[in-house]
Amino acid sequence: MIHAYNKSYLSAAQKNLARMLDYLVNDLHYPLETAWQWFVTSELSARFEQGDCSVLVGLSGVELARAVLEQAGEVVPMQKPSYAYDRSPEYWTGWALAYYQWLTSLRFAEIKQAVSITKVRLLYTPYHEMDVRQFADKMNELYRAAKPETNLKAMRTLAGLSQSELAGQADVPVRTIQQYEQRQKDINKAQAETLLRLARALNCNVEDLMEKVPPLNFK
C-alpha cells in the first residue's frame, strides 16, 4: 500500500489535525460537522493530504484551525486554546483520521463522503483504547459498506459506457474488465499499459482507477 507521505511526518500531522478539531469544537464551539466541512473544502486539506510540510509541520494545530477559518470566510478569533489533561473525543477523531488518510492515501473528501465525521466521532468508544490499526480496519469496513463498487466500475458508469463498449475503446478484453469490477483480479496489480488504456478511454487518471482501501472479500 502506498502511503500519502513520509511516515516521519505522521506523528506531527496527527497531533495538528487533532488539535485543530479540538480547538474549533471545544474552544470556539463550532459544530463538529461544520468544522470538518470547512477543513475538507479548504485548500489546506489538499495540501495536508499531499504531504505539504508547510502544513503538516509548519503550522501548529491552532494555527491550522485559524487558517481554515480564514479560508472559510469566518472571523478569526485570537482566543487561546485550553489544554485539558484528558484528550477530548474530537481530539482523538482528528488524530485517528490523520492516520487513516496517511495509511490509505484517500482524499479527506473521499473519506467524508463514505463515513461522516459524526460516525467517526462515535467510534471514540471503544477505539480510543485500541491500537489505531484496529480503527483503520473498522474504517475500511465502513468505507467498503458505503462504497462497495470498484473505482473502475464507478468511472465506467460515470462515462456512460457498458463493459463491452469500454473494452472496445480501451482495447482490453471484456473478461478482464469484468474480473476487475468483480474483484476476481486486483486492479492494483494490473500492467501499466492496461491501466493507461483504461484511463484514456475513461478520460481519467490512472490513480483514479486504483483501489486504496482493501476489499472485504478479496482473497
Question: Predicted regions span which residues?
Answer:
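C-terminal alpha-helical interaction appendages
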Residues: 1-103, 130, 135-141
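Recognition helix of helix-turn-helix/homeodomain-like DNA-binding domains
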Residues: 53, 172-188
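Short, basic-rich loop-to-helix N-cap that marks the start of a DNA-contacting helix
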Residues: 57, 185-197
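DNA major-groove recognition helix of helix-turn-helix/homeodomain DNA-binding modules
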Residues: 65-72, 192-208
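A short, Lys/Arg-rich alpha-helix, primarily the initiator
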Residues: 137-160
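Conserved hydrophobic/aromatic packing and binding residues within compact polymer-binding modules
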Residues: 152, 163-167, 177-180, 209
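Short coil turns linking two alpha-helices in DNA-binding domains
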Residues: 162, 173-176, 191, 205
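Short, charged recognition helix plus adjacent turn
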Residues: 210-219
